[in-house]
C-alpha cells in the first residue's frame, strides 16, 4: 500500500509540473489564432503537398483535428516541414506548437527530451532491402555494406546496434 501511495504521489506531482506547460502552449495557440504544426518533409500519405499546394496525409489530418478541437476550424493550421534532425529542436524551442510526424517513441526520448508524447497512431517495422541480384539470404551477409539512411532517426541507431552486436562493419 505504501508503494502505491508513493507511486501515486510522484505521478501526481509530475502531472502538476506538466499541466502549466501544456496550458501555456494552448494559451499561446489560442492568442495567435492558429496552430503551428511540425510535419515531415514531403512524405506522401503522411504529409505532402498536392499539385495545388494543399497539404494532405495522415499527419496533416492530425494537425487539422487539433485545430478543429481548439478553434472549431480545421483550416487554422500553419504547417512547418521538418526533417528528423530538426523536429525535436523545433518543438523544444517553441518554433512549432506540436509535432505530428514520424517519430519513434523510445524510453530515452520520453524521459530525456522534456516532451510529452501522445498515443501511437501508426506502427511500422524495419528491415533491409537489397537487390535480388546480390543473392543475399541473411542480414549476416551484409558485413561491409553501404546503407542509405536518414540521420538522427531510431533506424540509424538500430542499424548501428545490429552491426555492433554482430561484429560487422557498414557505411551509412
Enumerate the language-model features and the residues they cover.
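N-terminal hydrophobic or amphipathic helices and topogenic motifs
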Residues: 2-13, 20-78
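Structured segments of extracytoplasmic/periplasmic soluble domains
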Residues: 32, 40, 65, 69-73, ...
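Short loop->beta-strand "edge-of-pocket" segments that line small-molecule binding or catalytic clefts
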Residues: 34-40, 56, 140-156
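Short coil/turn segments
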Residues: 42, 104-105, 131-135, 147-155
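Ligand-binding cleft/hinge of the Venus flytrap
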Residues: 49-52, 64-75, 117, 155-172
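Soluble non-cytosolic domains of exported or imported proteins
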Residues: 53-61, 82-85, 149-154
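Acidic, polar ligand-binding/catalytic clefts
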Residues: 64, 68, 76-141
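Histidine/lysine/aspartate-rich catalytic loop segments that bind and position anionic ligands
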Residues: 123-126, 152-159
Amino acid at each position: 500500500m505504501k508503494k502505491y501511495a508513493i507511486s501515486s504521489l510522484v505521478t501526481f506531482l509530475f502531472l502538476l509540473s506538466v499541466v502549466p506547460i501544456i496550458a501555456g502552449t494552448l494559451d499561446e495557440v489560442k492568442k495567435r489564432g492558429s496552430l503551428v504544426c511540425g510535419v515531415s518533409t514531403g512524405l506522401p500519405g503522411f504529409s505532402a503537398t498536392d499539385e495545388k499546394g494543399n497539404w494532405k496525409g495522415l499527419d496533416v489530418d492530425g494537425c487539422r483535428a487539433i485545430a478543429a478541437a481548439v478553434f472549431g476550424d480545421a483550416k487554422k493550421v500553419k504547417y512547418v516541414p521538418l526533417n528528423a534532425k530538426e523536429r525535436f529542436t523545433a518543438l523544444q524551442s517553441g518554433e512549432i506548437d506540436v509535432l505530428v510526424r514520424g517519430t519513434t517513441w523510445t524510453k530515452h526520448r520520453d524521459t530525456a527530451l522534456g516532451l510529452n508524447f501522445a498515443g501511437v497512431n501508426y506502427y511500422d517495422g524495419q528491415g533491409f532491402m537489397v537487390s535480388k541480384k546480390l543473392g543475399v539470404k541473411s542480414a549476416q551477409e551484409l558485413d561491409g555494406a553501404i546503407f542509405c539512411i536518414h540521420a538522427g532517426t531510431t533506424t540509424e541507431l538500430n542499424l548501428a546496434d545490429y552491426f555492433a552486436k554482430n561484429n560487422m562493419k557498414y557505411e551509412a
